[in-house]
Amino acid sequence: MANYFNTLNLRQKLDQLGRCRFMDRNEFADGCNFLKGKKIVIVGCGAQGLNQGLNMRDSGLDISYALRAEAIAEKRASFTRATENGFKVGTYQELIPTADLVINLTPDKQHSKVVADVVPLMKQGSAFGYSHGFNIVEEGEQIRKDITVVMTAPKCPGTEVREEYKRGFGVPTLIAVHPENDPKGEGMAIAKAWASATGGDRAGVLESSFVAEVKSDLMGEQTILCGMLQAGSIVCYDKLVADGKDPAYASKLIQYGWETITEALKQGGITLMMDRLSNAAKIRAFELSEEIKVQLNDLYLKHMDDIISGEFSSTMMADWANGDVNLFKWREETGKTAFENSPKADGIKISEQEYFDNGVVMVAMVKAGVEMAFDAMVASGIYEESAYYESLHELPLIANTIARKRLYEMNVVISDTAEYGNYLFSHVATPILAEKLIPMLQKGDLGEPTPAAEIDNVYLRDINDAIRNHPVELIGQELRGYMTDMKRISSQG
């Protein structure tokens, strides 16, 4: 199969990359009625599969799970999750032929096999759904022309999709219809109803495209969302220990620091995050962020270029074909880092403000990383709304996974695709930061507060203006207006 994006001409590529419209709430007045009375079968019962299914069932839809015969016979985790939650479970042959909508929520690397096994069993005129378009865009999967192909992609891990729904809210969601597969013109109605059933319409829905979702999603997860947090965790921990800090304190400052810092980011963007610092620390964080951009911007652009060209996906799929040799090797190497093996911080107390005061360079990494990822996406034709959701918006959710069980938890929760891209980025970014940024750090940049200093009002004013007028802040202020009931996320120890 050929990479679908690479088969498009330039005009088509730009059109697909630029598909992005924030949908009005009244467009969801019918809720999920379009899917009521229809048989919906979910393939896969992992985090997204289970939690989307729970939400859809609670919204009044008919949900069942199709699993491989061996998964049922051996009572594997997917079978146990589905049955313990009271869902009907059957084999592909038992459930797929009567389904009106089949939703594929298996890992990316399984999609081609799932399509080969499932689509021939689907009835004429039915629909097939994804929550990530990698199989369509990067692998070039071609689905039977009588089948409608749609995507509903919540911009959160599956656990948060469920928790926000239970609160009566939801998570921001991208929806799309594959232009090659909408024979009856019902694709958008299906995607809207699916998004409503998961609660997405309560938090905001972007009408997007398979292409825009995939290219922006890959860029965000490889760079700021996972790669930058991994590289930053490793170099900051090593620096603290080298400076004589208690390893347990250093571990806690890093492990819970990302989460605490990005909670402010979630509520008020980079502006609020920077406002949590003293004036002297804010100036220093701004200066460090500009230096980080000098050091890493070329790497961000390379990742964006490799994603657009298909180089990243072809490299990763070659590793799939080789039994994930590189993925497993890199996962093992991550488990051996000093940060991952640092002592637990039992009894050590760090106040919320101390995470900011003693983590100025971490704040700088977040600021620089978000802005570089956002700018690279927009420069490649991705609209600002999509770039915001795939950079700033998801960052607190990923930081929360590190707070739970460090980098191990982050890499378990994210997809294998995200994990592979994370390693590609962090393996290059970590030595750059260690060799260029860390030697530049001064007293007060990490592990202790920034010393008081005389402040130049004009310089501070200009820095504040630069922070508040970056495009990610301008679009972020607008989009956060649709998410007026965001809960605080905290695993703080």
UniProtKB/Swiss-Prot annotation:
Substrate binds at S415. Binds 2 magnesium ions per subunit. NADP(+) binds at C45, G46, A47, Q48, R68, R76, S78, D108, K109, Q110, G158. The active site is at H132. Mg(2+) 1 binds at D217, E221. The keyword Methyltransferase does not apply. Pathway: Amino-acid biosynthesis; L-isoleucine biosynthesis; L-isoleucine from 2-oxobutanoate: step 2/4; Amino-acid biosynthesis; L-valine biosynthesis; L-valine from pyruvate: step 2/4. It catalyses: (2R)-2,3-dihydroxy-3-methylbutanoate + NADP(+) = (2S)-2-acetolactate + NADPH + H(+); (2R,3R)-2,3-dihydroxy-3-methylpentanoate + NADP(+) = (S)-2-ethyl-2-hydroxy-3-oxobutanoate + NADPH + H(+). It is an enzyme of class 1 (oxidoreductase). Its cofactor is Mg(2+). GO terms for cellular component: cytosol. GO terms for molecular function: ketol-acid reductoisomerase activity; magnesium ion binding. It holds the Pfam family KARI_N. Residues 14-208 form the KARI N-terminal Rossmann domain. Mg(2+) 2 binds at D217, E390, E394. InterPro entries: 6-PGluconate_DH-like_C_sf, 6PGD_dom2, KARI, KARI_C, KARI_N, NAD(P)-bd_dom_sf. It comes from the Bacteria. Its EC number is 1.1.1.86. Involved in the biosynthesis of branched-chain amino acids (BCAA). Catalyzes an alkyl-migration followed by a ketol-acid reduction of (S)-2-acetolactate (S2AL) to yield (R)-2,3-dihydroxy-isovalerate. In the isomerase reaction, S2AL is rearranged via a Mg-dependent methyl migration to produce 3-hydroxy-3-methyl-2-ketobutyrate (HMKB). In the reductase reaction, this 2-ketoacid undergoes a metal-dependent reduction by NADPH to yield (R)-2,3-dihydroxy-isovalerate. Belongs to the ketol-acid reductoisomerase family. This is Ketol-acid reductoisomerase (NADP(+)).
